[in-house]
Design a protein with these regions (language model features):
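N-terminally biased helix-coil "hinge/interface" segments that flank
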Residues: 1-217
Length: 217
């Protein structure tokens, strides 16, 4: 379970890696062995929307620039901001790397202001009165459901009992949601790697270099 800023990638492991030898990337057929990975547009930078009737998470992403609203660069509300709103991300524990000059802390105040404005808008348009934190929790539930459904596609829908597995979690945003995703699936064990935030890069550095060439005869 690899949750980054733009998307979440999931794969199944049961004693061996599952590989695909032919896949489509941007409409182009690729014939090369690669991990069988299922991807959904749910990441820490996924933009939160209210369309007048329902909440939506993504598929648009704020990316690293401007990034989430809490980055102090004028970005929109995102999944990361929802975690700030509910207290999972506490700005005082993060380095001062944000803002236009890269020397300011995460901005919790702007997150609370924007969620308060969004809660007021939702009440005005629907009559549904919720606190800003409840609005943020609603968006997080949708994001968790999207990620849980992705895991179901590589497990339950293929006949595997996901409750017997350990959820191996990494990626910059994975630890914020791993337990909620596990609860949604009935998984009782979660493993968060010590290098979770940089594990993909770490793995690339340790990977063997392999070249495959094909020639039609």
């Amino acid at each position: 379970f690899d949750m980054g800023g733009t998307s979440t990638d999931v794969a199944h492991f049961d004693g061996e890696y599952e590989r695909a030898f032919e896949t489509m990337v941007a409409g182009v057929r690729m014939r090369a062995p690669m991990m069988r990975i299922h991807t959904v547009a749910a990441g820490g930078g996924s933009v939160l929307h209210f369309d007048g009737a329902r909440y939506r998470v993504g598929p648009e992403s704020a990316g690293a620039e401007p990034g989430p609203a809490c980055y102090r660069r004028g970005g929109p509300l995102t999944v990361t901001d929802a975690n700030v709103m509910v207290g999972k991300i506490q700005p005082e524990y993060f380095p001062r790397l944000f803002g236009p000059g890269g020397d300011e802390p995460l901005n919790g105040d702007v997150v609370r202001e924007q969620f308060a404005a969004l809660a007021a808008r939702i009440e005005a348009e629907t009559g549904d009165k919720r606190t800003p934190a409840e609005v943020a929790e609603g968006f997080l539930r949708i994001a968790v459901e999207n990620m849980a459904n992705a895991i179901k596609q590589v497990s339950i829908q293929r006949g595997y009992d996901v409750t017997e597995y350990t959820l191996n979690c990494f990626g910059g945003a994975g630890g914020q949601h791993a337990c909620l995703v596990a609860d949604a699936l009935g998984i009782t064990r979660v493993f968060v790697h010590p290098f979770a935030g940089v594990l993909s890069a770490y793995g690339m550095g340790l990977a063997d270099l392999r070249v495959m060439r094909e020639h039609a005869v």
